[in-house]
Amino acid sequence: MVSAKDILSDSLRSSVLIIKHKDKLSPDYVPENLPHREEKIKELGFIFKDLLAGDAKDSERVVILGRTGTGKTATVRLFGKNFEDIAEREYGVKVKYVHINCYRHRTLYLISQEIANALKLPIPSRGLSAQEVFKMIHEYLDRRNIHLIVALDEFGHFLNTANTEEIYFLVRLYDEISAIIKRISYIFIVNESHSIYKLDRSIRDHIARRLIEFPPYKSMELYDILKYRVDEAFNDNAVDDEVLQFISNTYGYDKGGNGNARIAIETLSLAGEIAEKEGSPVVLLDHAKKANSTINPEIQEIIDSLSYLDLHQLILLKALIRALNKTKADEITMGTLEEEYISLSREFNEEPRRHTQVYEYLRKLKVIGIINTRQSGKGMRGRTTLVSLSLPLDKRLDDYIMQQIMVRLKSRA
């Protein structure tokens, strides 16, 4: 009998490793370049450039607004790191950048403590108020001639927790602290605009004078982001290009996705792990589909929505699965799909619907997220619609669709 230890040893020896730098697929990783966020970094630079003047007297404030996964945190972190370095190396100005997550530090006191810790500023053991700590921080910066940029990530959590007086103190700090040089500047990062616009006007007008919006990523932008991460994290030629196309089309905002780069990268990472587990030296489309069905929170909703489809929509979906299995391809032409649909309809003793109706069924299936469509490019004569399944080809899915078809047919009997 083979021991558990030997089984483990054999497994480790035979395992295929195609991800060489897994940390570069982590949500916390900030790469040296951020595709399609270069202009946002330039905007931040323009706002904070006055801090580089030797006689800078004023502080700056900016709101960063965008959905989760639109690159807000990574962009601000990269800006802060590079601005700090450029300020000292090229301008001889001392700038300290501090990034604070308000989900973990959602009170004025915790924020003041986190800033003090980042500055290595010793706080007396006797209890000090947050306001007193902020005054100590400013005095510390003044003595050392340092400008401080504080990025308050997930700032909405602070706004929902703190009282009006604490919010006012933080935002309008220099109404409370007398200073010739205002050394503390802020970057407020929020997911939703209403967290800012519900504030008292005296606070809102002060905080939202400058606003940088981060739109959801389009599919082409997600493709570039994923390609960059593949080059950083995977072995050469280890990820098939159609994997990147599939993930970027699934999550691209212009394709009906949420435009979330974080989930797109997570899907890529899991697809790599699935490929390694299966012993494949290359991440293939099926690995990406399996990863997507695990990660995508909408997948179960998609499957649940099948019960609401009518008979011919289900037959069309069944025809797509059958045609994909026959051709062993990842996508088929609209013509091939219609031929399979007509054949399958007759097997069920159903009159096939006309082309315009079939196209409308296809549009409905795309809206609920179970199929993808695209226009053919080079390599095909003429322009045609190519159709693919957004979920892995799975017998359980096929059986469920067949079950739903039989339910519809029996209800007619």
UniProtKB/Swiss-Prot annotation:
Report the CDD domains cross-referenced here. Cdc6_C
User: What is the superkingdom listed in this entry's lineage?
Assistant: Archaea
Q: Which SUPFAM superfamilies match?
A: P-loop containing nucleoside triphosphate hydrolases, Winged helix' DNA-binding domain
Which Pfam families does this one have? AAA_22 (PF13401), Cdc6_C (PF09079), Cdc6_lid (PF22703)
Q: Which InterPro entries match?
A: AAA+_ATPase, AAA_22, Cdc6_C, Cdc6_lid, ORC1/CDC6, Orc1/Cdc6_arc, P-loop_NTPase, WH-like_DNA-bd_sf
Asked if the keyword Transport belongs to this entry, the reply reads: no
GO BP annotations of the record are: DNA replication
Q: Which UniProt keywords apply?
A: ATP-binding, DNA replication, DNA-binding, Nucleotide-binding
Q: Which residues form a coiled coil?
A: none
Residues given in the record as ATP binding sites: T70, G71, K72, T73, A74, Y217, R229
Q: Name one GO molecular function term.
A: DNA binding
**HAMAP family cross-referenced by the UniProt entry:** ORC1_type_DNA_replic_protein
According to its UniProt record, which protein family does this protein belong to?
Belongs to the CDC6/cdc18 family.
Q: Which PANTHER family match?
A: CELL DIVISION CONTROL PROTEIN 6-RELATED, ORC1-TYPE DNA REPLICATION PROTEIN 2
Q: What is known of its domains?
A: The C-terminal WH domain is essential for its stimulating effect on the MCM-loading activity.
Q: Subunit notes for this chain?
A: Monomer. Interacts with Cdc6-3, MCM and PolB1.
Main role? Involved in regulation of DNA replication. May play essential roles in origin recognition and cell cycle control of replication. Binds both single-stranded and double-stranded DNA, with a preference for molecules that contain a bubble, a fork, or a tail. Has a weak ATPase activity. Stimulates the binding of the MCM helicase to the origin DNA, but strongly inhibits ATPase and DNA helicase activities of MCM. Also regulates the DNA polymerase and the nuclease activities of PolB1.
What's the protein here called?
A: ORC1-type DNA replication protein 2
